[in-house]
Amino acid sequence: MRDYGLIGKRLGHSFSQQYFTQKFAAENRPDCRYSLYELSDISEFEELVRSHPDLLGLNITIPYKQTVIPLLDEVDVEAARVGAVNTVRIFRDGNAAHTVGFNTDVEGFRLSLAGHQVPTRALVLGTGGAAAAVMHVLRDWDVDCRLV
């Protein structure tokens, strides 16, 4: 079985498990499973990876997008620049696991503005990992932006 999942503190609001279960079924991937992993503290991350040998990838949500970074073996250059990770890929070699963090919010935000005029000013609401990705893109485009 190829396991994937979402980690966060409280996941009752999440539709990720339903979404990915339907996606795996639609793509005829009975070998894939998506689970929710509520962690009371990010220090539980390494034990989660260690105790689930079929776990190959995780989405990261509130409040762990920033605090997971020091626990990873490697962080993608863009995710390091943003200071937030929302996706972790887990490479397995026997019992050993190598974790690599990425930030897919950056590319998602860039693509959402493709074909649109880039603003000269922007107000970003929120202070979490997704807001950090938005600010990163706007600053790359020399947009005068404020964070609230």
Model-derived regions: residue spans:
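Short coil/turn segments at beta-strand junctions that form active-site/ligand-binding loops
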Residues: 53-56, 120-121, 143
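Glycine-rich adenosine-cofactor-binding loop
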Residues: 8, 103-106, 113-114, 119-141
